[in-house]
Amino acid sequence: MAKKSKIERNKQRVALVKRYAAKREALLSTANDESLPMEDRFEARLKLAELPRNANPTRIRNRCAMTGRPRAYYRKLGISRVALRDLGSRGMIPGLVKSSW
């Protein structure tokens, strides 16, 4: 089980990303638009730099929904390999069978 502080910090980052998503998208489109003058583009870059650091989506860490484990995360299921193995062995995931050959 991951530390609760790490899990909560990641939840706060997710909330910040959602809050600033529209503003960030607008500033990025302005900054990358080559038809605009260089001064406007530079000003958009400065405003983008003023946004909170944790408002950047790359700062979010994928974590297991059950344990909070940050590694071996399966995106399709939203859980880690440890939780997948545990749920699979208990028959809680439909269609998942132990392989044998």
Swiss-Prot record:
Keyword Protease tagged: no
Chain coiled-coil ranges: none
Keywords of this entry: Ribonucleoprotein, Ribosomal protein, RNA-binding, rRNA-binding
Domain of life the protein comes from: Bacteria
Protein name: Small ribosomal subunit protein uS14
Gene (UniProt): rpsN
Native organism: Methylobacterium sp. (strain 4-46)
SUPFAM superfamilies tied to this protein: Glucocorticoid receptor-like (DNA-binding domain) (SSF57716)
Assembly: Part of the 30S ribosomal subunit. Contacts proteins S3 and S10.
Chain's role: Binds 16S rRNA, required for the assembly of 30S particles and may also be responsible for determining the conformation of the 16S rRNA at the A site.
GO BP terms in the entry: translation
NCBIfam families registered for this protein in UniProt: PRK08881.1
Cellular component, GO, one term: small ribosomal subunit
